[in-house]
């Protein structure tokens, strides 16, 4: 659990898009190996195919590539595919690991021509390393400062031509100079249920899980549009099927297993439902501040804001307003309650089916 989350949240929710213990090795076995095997993101795949094919035809390295989007959508898998399509070696690191310029210089000095350098969470790279990266991306060289004070000297070092692939969940947190140095930027969107079902059927084949078509659709519909969540739910359903049934995952088995893990039809878990229930039942639908809402569910504000809210907002159940969080009609309905007729969003009355006056109404004076 991240220290900033605190509270009672253990970070092990089956519908968390972040990596949790046990995901790493299994995710590696499920990753697609080339663009043809990658399911979903058709626009990104087409654009990347053009970028990579063009570079190979010219015999050079492609432009630096930035992959942005929420966690769990396949940015790391796409970076590995880029290296495989180019026939190059992949060097992996992360923004938080590059605390000093020397850390980056050591990594860059070990690159050979054509290598792909993947920096995950690139928005968290330290400022000194980021400034060194500017020169490396543009001119394939770095200036290493030796010594301190007036006697310090700068030694230029050549860097083999490489392709940087950066991944970020917060593209807005990137500085302008860094963002401008990427020649191609791809935003990865959430997946459709049909795409997630395809991913699940492929993963089931790799893991040796007997997964029925209807069961695949059932799991996909609760996966929040995220392949990482879909694959994690598949493993939990597999456990249930092997322990309490004959190992075959049917729709009924999937439904029963997901009920055990507190994942409902929309992919909401216990904490999500607690937040909705508190917002509607304790505060009449809001508006209410996130700190007050967090106290009501016994969690830290950061947990509510970073773990629960993104999906609840995307699902249209919570609206963020200047006055606080407001429950939408969908939230009331999800809890089996009737929305109030005078629904209010952020202090503004929602007017439904009101005819708009004509500018050319002959009865107007």
Swiss-Prot record:
Sites binding ATP sit at 30-31, 72, 75-77, 138-140, 181, 191, 228
| Main subcellular location | cytoplasm
- Region (Large ATPase domain (RuvB-L)): which ranges? 1-191
Q: Where does DNA bind?
A: 320, 325
Where does the record place it?
A: Cytoplasm
**CDD domains this protein is in?**
AAA
Catalyzed reactions: ATP + H2O = ADP + phosphate + H(+)
Keyword terms: ATP-binding, Cytoplasm, DNA damage, DNA recombination, DNA repair, DNA-binding, Hydrolase, Nucleotide-binding
Any Pfam family: AAA_lid_4
Q: Which residues bind Mg(2+)?
A: 76
Q: Which GO terms describe its molecular function?
A: ATP binding; ATP hydrolysis activity; four-way junction DNA binding; four-way junction helicase activity
Enzyme class comes to: hydrolase
Residue segments, region Small ATPAse domain (RuvB-S):
192-262
Stretches for region Head domain (RuvB-H): 265-365
Q: Listed GO cellular component terms?
A: cytoplasm; Holliday junction resolvase complex
Task: Please provide the Gene Ontology terms (biological process) for this protein.
Answer: DNA recombination; DNA repair
Could you tell me the EC number(s) of this protein? 3.6.4.-
This protein's assembly is summarised as: Homohexamer. Forms an RuvA(8)-RuvB(12)-Holliday junction (HJ) complex. HJ DNA is sandwiched between 2 RuvA tetramers; dsDNA enters through RuvA and exits via RuvB. An RuvB hexamer assembles on each DNA strand where it exits the tetramer. Each RuvB hexamer is contacted by two RuvA subunits (via domain III) on 2 adjacent RuvB subunits; this complex drives branch migration. In the full resolvosome a probable DNA-RuvA(4)-RuvB(12)-RuvC(2) complex forms which resolves the HJ.
User: HAMAP family from the xrefs?
Assistant: DNA_HJ_migration_RuvB (MF_00016)
Q: What does this protein do?
A: The RuvA-RuvB-RuvC complex processes Holliday junction (HJ) DNA during genetic recombination and DNA repair, while the RuvA-RuvB complex plays an important role in the rescue of blocked DNA replication forks via replication fork reversal (RFR). RuvA specifically binds to HJ cruciform DNA, conferring on it an open structure. The RuvB hexamer acts as an ATP-dependent pump, pulling dsDNA into and through the RuvAB complex. RuvB forms 2 homohexamers on either side of HJ DNA bound by 1 or 2 RuvA tetramers; 4 subunits per hexamer contact DNA at a time.
The family classification in the record reads: Belongs to the RuvB family.
How are the domains described in the entry?
A: Has 3 domains, the large (RuvB-L) and small ATPase (RuvB-S) domains and the C-terminal head (RuvB-H) domain. The head domain binds DNA, while the ATPase domains jointly bind ATP, ADP or are empty depending on the state of the subunit in the translocation cycle. During a single DNA translocation step the structure of each domain remains the same, but their relative positions change.
Q: Any idea what this protein is called?
A: Holliday junction branch migration complex subunit RuvB
Organism, scientific name = Rhodococcus opacus (strain B4)
